[in-house]
């Protein structure tokens, strides 16, 4: 999925995102709203990922859910 697809399909994939990253709350997911930078920031703060690791995790997720 590309950026536009993620943002457009956010309501449909929120559950999949929450399954993978269970520390994300419903409020977090609403705040993120499919926006890449918001997602990366949450992964960094909740999981202690470096920026590079968060980017890799998010890219891997997108590639898996095309």
Swiss-Prot record:
Gene3D superfamilies: YjbJ. InterPro entries: CsbD, UPF0337_stress_rsp, YjbJ, YjbJ_sf. It comes from the Bacteria. Pfam families: CsbD. Belongs to the UPF0337 (CsbD) family. This is UPF0337 protein pc0632.
């Amino acid at each position: 999925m590309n950026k536009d697809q993620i943002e457009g399909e956010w309501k449909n994939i929120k559950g999949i995102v929450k399954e993978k990253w269970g520390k994300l709350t419903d409020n977090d997911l609403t705040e993120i709203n499919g926006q890449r930078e918001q997602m990366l920031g949450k992964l960094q703060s909740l999981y202690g990922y470096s920026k590079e690791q968060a980017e890799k995790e998010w890219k891997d997720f997108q590639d898996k859910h095309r």
